[in-house]
Design a protein with these regions (language model features):
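HIT superfamily nucleotide-processing domains
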Residues: 1-159
Length: 159
């Protein structure tokens, strides 16, 4: 999709999209990474303990799916997914990082990255890693500390 075609994709009002709204405000731990094309933050569960190692990579522009991305956005999403995956492995000791894209709940491109920790039983692999009772969980302070480590890794490893 060319830059001109991308500008012609219908845009939802920013206030109607929870991802657009979130990117304009504050998130627990702050953004892990952001530039003009992409944004990443650690997900925080306000209703209980948060699984440590769940980061979302999102486009800055309101684009519903991969089909609407410009070449520059597609490249930026892919590169950031790889960088954040490396950061999650280095900063959490995860032995694997899952990437999920569903695209049918919130129409703003976002990819879910989940760390899988050593010893995670196979029945809790994939989208169930956070359901394992022994998976690392924490509150706002632990999320903020992990975000700081992730930002540090990304700053020291720009590629």
């Amino acid at each position: 999709m060319s830059e001109t075609q991308a500008s012609q994709v219908p845009q939802a009002p920013l206030e109607a999209c929870p991802i657009c709204v979130k990117q304009q405000g504050e998130v627990i731990g702050g953004p892990v990474y952001q530039d003009d094309l992409v944004y990443a933050n650690h997900v925080y569960n306000r209703e209980g303990p948060t699984f440590l190692g769940y980061v979302r990579v999102e486009t800055r522009r309101h684009a519903p799916s991969f089909a609407e991305l410009t070449p520059a956005e597609a490249q930026a999403v892919g590169v950031l997914m790889a960088r954040v995956s490396r950061a999650l492995k280095a900063c959490t000791g995860a032995d694997h990082v899952y990437a999920f894209f569903y695209g049918d709940h919130v129409p703003h491109l976002h990819v879910h990255l989940f760390a899988r920790y050593p010893g995670t039983p196979e029945e809790f692999w994939r989208e169930r890693v956070d359901e394992w009772s022994e998976s690392p969980k924490g509150g706002a302070d632990e999320v903020a500390a992990l975000c700081q480590r992730l930002r540090g890794f990304l700053a020291e490893n720009p590629q």
